[in-house]
Amino acid sequence: MSKIAVSLCGEGRGHATRICTLVEHLERDHDVLLFTSADAWELLSKRFGDGHPRVRVEEIPGILFQYTDGRLDVLRSIAAGLDYQARQLGPLVDRLMGQLDEFHADLAITDFEPALPRAASRQGIPLVSVDHQHFLLAYDLDGLPWSLQWNAWFMSHAVWMYVVEATDTVVSAFFRPPLRRGWEHVVQVGPLLRREITEAVPSEGAFLLSYLRRHTPFSAIEALADCGLPVKVYGLGQRDSVGNVSFHAIDERRFVEDLAGCRALVSAAGNQLIGESLHLGKPLLALPERAHAEQMMNSYFLNAMGCGDFALLEEVTAVRVRTFLDGLGNYAPALAGVQGRIDGTADVIRIITHRLDVCAEAATAPAPESEPALPGPCG
């Protein structure tokens, strides 16, 4: 048994879903201490409450996207990140160092969260980075439009800020272009899929499923309401229906049932949800936010794979949704090639297990006779 500290970005639910999958495997044999914020803290504190004695969830301050008039505000988001780095990151690192020492952590794992990597580095604890965002650094993105390539270069600097000195770097993505020169050490895996997804049996129902982020413009709801099929929307809370659109509170079990049973998705363009959809063979019309470059990149790769299409969230119309629905058969061949074949969970568990084995061997290795053993990270 080992002691593993895990941190993750609290924005949205993709990071939380990915880490939830890992922790479900790790808690069988290890003690796990989780650090997160916002949406992820809400989800994980409930998921690993009573009945999970080997998992503890701690709330920490985190960085969130900033919105103005319902749209992602890149400049305000950057300013908020810089303010977090200047005012909160240092004290948080000091706090986590104390908690790592008290916990006697053997390994740290992070999904795009900046404090734990720094605390682990100072404590000499090996770090495994498992996230989606490292594709901005490691992947050959020459196939994207030049504007998105520029955005990837710009955003890659934030990845450097978040994660320092990782012993192992894993990129989890539903797409897999070649690695850039100098990044051959990165391990590419598919999305990390929770047990409920891998055990779900897909069927083709007579409704659409949609997961939308807060600040979704009402025009997008109107487009869904006039698409010709019932639409179940998650992510915006429970509220009165709008035409054929019904709104549902987040319920993980019910959401998976609807994902497995829907005809298709018209949804936000997060890596995790796209991966879950592809695993179940569901075509997807992604709705990236105009200013959200990562969502735009995910959408381009989805389209290039032939498994779906995309429309800007701010511009989607009922006609665009109906056109997508009329062409669902066009996506069947590509979906058949990935359905049930993209889960990367086992690959990540092997990497973590290997790192723990290396640490255990280093801890029990006899010291050279000529000099005493020195504490330090296991590499």
Give the positions of each predicted feature.
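Conserved nucleotide-sugar donor-binding subdomain of glycosyltransferases
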Residues: 72-107, 114-115
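Conserved nucleotide-sugar phosphate-binding/catalytic loop shared by glycosyltransferases and other
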Residues: 10, 28, 33-86
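C-terminal amphipathic helix plus adjacent low-complexity
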Residues: 322-379
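Donor-nucleotide binding loops and adjacent catalytic segments primarily
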Residues: 23, 190-264
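A donor-sugar binding/catalytic signature common to diverse glycosyltransferases
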Residues: 108-111, 258-297
